[in-house]
């Protein structure tokens, strides 16, 4: 059962944003850094006059057959096309700065701390969102490479952005624990305490 085409058009948020004055802009870093593989999931953060973006780079191309799965690849409706010599699905993040025309003026790879050897095939901080809290920048996302089962847990990493030296470095990392029986979590947030 597919969705009604009229309903699909009504759900197109990008189209609605453009119709109401929004702009589209390509977010591209040099292909020498990405080897031509995917850029996705930008997280836009406006900090005063600065427009900052966390841009996710993956070492694969994702083929996904939408629209009632009418156009699947020979491997099925969802396929990861990755280098033959590296079967892992690796995420790296880039912090970018845009001007008011949404043109990229700076970009820098986020140097993550080497706290562990990845033990699952999904490697890196996935779907990271850039936030600022008490004048410190953080990336908040999910990491699945710390267990042999690929269990994803939210993590937040404090980062230092140094535009003068074109560096972004992870300073600290906190893995948000699984809630205990007497703890509660707010959706999309850090632990909220004892839940009492």
Question: Where are the predicted features?
Answer:
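Beta-rich carbohydrate-recognition and catalytic domains
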Residues: 1-121, 132-196
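A conserved donor-nucleotide-binding helix/loop in the catalytic core
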Residues: 124-130
